[in-house]
Curated annotation (Swiss-Prot):
GO biological process: glutamine catabolic process; pyridoxal phosphate biosynthetic process; pyridoxine metabolic process
Domain of life from the UniProt record: Bacteria
Name by which UniProt lists this protein: Pyridoxal 5'-phosphate synthase subunit PdxT
SUPFAM superfamilies from the UniProt entry: Class I glutamine amidotransferase-like (SSF52317)
Family: Belongs to the glutaminase PdxT/SNO family.
Family matches, as CDD domains: GATase1_PB (cd01749)
GO cellular component, one term: glutaminase complex
Organism of provenance: Leifsonia xyli subsp. xyli (strain CTCB07)
Length: 198
């Protein structure tokens, strides 16, 4: 869409293409971000699902970890799904040795909290923020938000009460993968944040 702010998808590892496809379908000027100079060109960023410890190592290796932290602290709208939620959390309860998050979201998360790949599942979630219609959510080796600090807001829980979606200012995080369900409302909600900041 002409005149749309540019939105990046962190393209170090994970389901980058799936997020780009959703963003393009919504008319966004979406691009891959692999280097600090590419990060400087975007008005919003999606951190995709994948493996959070690998993303952390790669971000440090290519010199993106510091610029990402600075951009988040500076108010850049960022949406993290699954591993992206882990990357945005202020605290990783069970990170591997040396693993660091980017921080910004006042939450503590536990990696792979729902179990292994074989225990992945799908369910419908209520999102009053996004409308009355439930959202179909895909959970793949998903994290869980174990605690939510006073600066963050819970957006959704699974039926047993565990938190799976949070928001804080320009930051969004989901333990599930809306890019795989066909429901574009979460990406639309994120784009509203991006447009509101430019």
């Amino acid at each position: 869409m002409a005149g749309s702010p540019r939105v990046g998808v962190l393209a170090l590892q994970g389901d980058v293409r799936e997020h780009l496809t959703v963003l393009w379908a919504l008319g966004a000027d979406a691009v891959r971000v692999r280097r600090p100079d590419e990060l400087e060109t975007v008005a919003g960023l999606v951190i995709p699902g994948g493996e959070s410890s690998v993303m952390d190592k790669l971000a440090r290796t290519v010199g993106l970890a510091g610029p990402l932290r600075n951009a988040i602290a500076g108010g850049l709208p960022v949406y993290g799904t699954c591993a992206g939620l882990i990357m945005l959390a202020d605290t990783i309860v069970d990170g591997i040795a040396g693993q660091r998050s980017l921080g910004g979201l006042d939450v503590a998360v536990r990696r792979n909290a729902f179990g292994s790949q074989a225990e992945s599942f799908e369910t419908d979630l209520s999102f009053p923020t996004l409308g009355a219609e439930p959202m179909h959510a895909v959970f793949i080796r998903a994290p869980i938000v174990e605690s939510v600090g006073p600066r963050a807001t819970v957006l959704a829980r699974v039926p047993d009460g565990r938190v799976v979606a949070v928001e804080q200012d320009n930051l969004l995080g989901t333990a599930f993968h809306p890019e795989l369900s066909g429901d574009k409302r979460f990406h639309e909600y994120f784009l509203v944040k991006v447009h509101g900041r430019v």
